Amino acid sequence: MSEIPPSHPRYISLITREKLVQAVHEGIVAYEGLTSHGRGEAFDYLLGEKTSPSGLNAEKLAARVLLAAKHPVLSINGNTAALAAKEIADLQKASDAEVEVNLFHRTDERVKQVSKVLEDAGCVLNKGIVERCIPLPHDRGLCDPRGIGSADVVLVPLEDGDRCEALVKMGKIV
């Protein structure tokens, strides 16, 4: 990892980027995940790099919905695992939600790598059967029918949105 002084005005951003680059080398994050992160960071710049009041309200509402769910599932991709595995483990404990790995650029090896990062952080993973439960023409449609497939609430921390739209059409709260 590069030596980045904490006084640098983009310190958190640069450290985050370095973590993702390292995760690419470890097989956790797909190369395309770096582009996804950059798109998200662009919005962060536009929003002044702080959580807006409406964003904070949305976070609080999401937490209440997750806690009230009958069958909540946290759907985790490589970027989320690389950047927030410990926080996902803490959220799982607080919400009693299942954690399921769901990858757009899916290989058995990446699923194993992402799973290991999450388990090392304390997550208990749903490693059930995988089949196409979500009507999408790519691997994000693959999930466990007893996990994401039957969840009433699915937390999707980082994603472009087509799967979120499909999950909502299936009657899930996303």
How would you describe each model-predicted region?
Residues 1-100:
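Electropositive, gly/pro-rich neighborhoods at or near active sites that engage anionic ligands
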Residues 92-93, 167-171:
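Short, conserved loop/helix-junction motifs that constitute active-site signature segments
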Residues 77-86, 105-109, 159-163:
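Gly/Ser/Thr-rich loops at beta-strand to alpha-helix junctions
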Residues 72, 154-155, 173-174:
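Short, well-ordered beta-strand core segments
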Residues 65-69, 146-152, 168-170:
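Flexible, charged surface loops at secondary-structure boundaries
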Residues 98, 172-173:
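Proline-centered loop/turn at the N-terminus of a beta-strand
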Residues 90-144:
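Long, charge-dense
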Residues 130-165:
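Active-site glycine-rich loop that binds ribose-phosphate moieties when present
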